[in-house]
Amino acid sequence: MKLRDYQIKLSDEGTEILKRKKIVCFFMEVRCGKTLTALQTCENVNAKRVLFITKIKAFSSIQWDYDQMNYRFNLTIINRESLHKIEGNNFDVVVIDEVHGYSSFPKPSKFHKDIKLRFGNIPMIMLSGTPTPESFSQFYHIFHLSNNSPFKHANFYKWAKDYVNVVIKNVGYAKVNDYSDAIKKDFWHLIRHHILTYTQKQAGFTTTVNEMILEVEMKPITYAIVKKLHKDLVVRSATTGKTIIADTGVKLQQKTHQLFSGTIKHEDGSIQIIDDSKAQFIKEKFDGYKIAIYYNFVAELKMLQNTFGNKLTTDLEEFNNSDKWIALQYQSGREGISLKKADHLIMFNIAFSAVTFWQSRDRMTTMDRKENTIFWIFSKRGIEERIYQTVQNKKDFTNSIFLKEYGIEKNRTADSNENNKQASQRRLALP
């Protein structure tokens, strides 16, 4: 195994930036080799101990890259939820994978605070294919992970006074400040010398992604529940006593999303599989192929496991070394892994996030693979097609879009208590 020419060039450039500025960002598109570029940079600066913060799903591939290259430094790979298990902070370099996951604003996340407190003085390598998927305002907290940030403002609000066009928005019955309109041209000169970018096109990728939408007729009960829920905002099972309540616009969106793929999470936290039509369709349609399946909700995984039995795994290493299918949740499986062994990528459901849409569909892309086929499994007359049309245009499927798509007035869900009392008297028999 050896580095590609552009990885050598990028790691050499990154080495100089890291030495001078203590922060280097490799903002490279998926499958361009961010991991190896970062590891080589650590080798170039003669690091002795390196901490690599990533998701559990990416552990094995990072370890494999490290082992293949016989690097001299000691590598510790960990997920951010387990940082408390590390004793001491004596690392020479900290690599933060998918750094956009720490870029929420206006307030930093708990994980952001943890990393800054413990490792803020250590040189950092930051990796992402989509550093600012929502707003250029995300740049502040990305760089503020380090105490060597080019932004000298003590907090986001002070930074926003200089670089953000703050807009007041009405949210429900309250007015809030919207900090998403950052003026990039005003601060780009401060950060551009920290950033190295590379695209799949520059790397020589010529992969064609073919997307096919396959529609599945769901069971009558699914359509009946959705219809009643949109009408009354509550559905109570006459057989189990379980209740589905959608007394806010967000809840109605979430419940509709769950139901059209055949599952529901009840108010008491329990989950129920109502309709396995999608899973049965996949079982019949893709028999004989090696597939990777993306799902959204825990109940969907349970349905897939019930349907496919021992044919299904959630372990990437087992998938790569057997004829089993793999099921991955969008949130944990969209970043940092490769599904190059899969014949097809199957999207059991679709997420509201545009970032998730674009990252997950690239999981099969490799330099020598010329064509990928992705199958979207949508319910007929369901919500999925509406989500798809939104996220493919790089926009999140927000609650306001949902309410507009379904012609629902915002104040209807907010003033639904009386509706719930009346509707609870009319029960629908769930499976």
Where on the chain are the PLM-derived regions?
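N-terminal pre-P-loop "Q-motif" helix
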Residues: M1-K19
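Conserved Helicase C-terminal RecA-like lobe
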Residues: M1-K2, K19-V24, E29-G33, T37-N46, ...
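SF2 helicase motor core recognition
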Residues: T35, L83-G88, S128-F136, A299-M303, ...
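Conserved P-loop NTPase motor "coupling/switch" region that bridges the ATPase
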Residues: V93, F111-Q200, R369
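A conserved SF2-helicase RecA2
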Residues: F352-W358, T365-P431
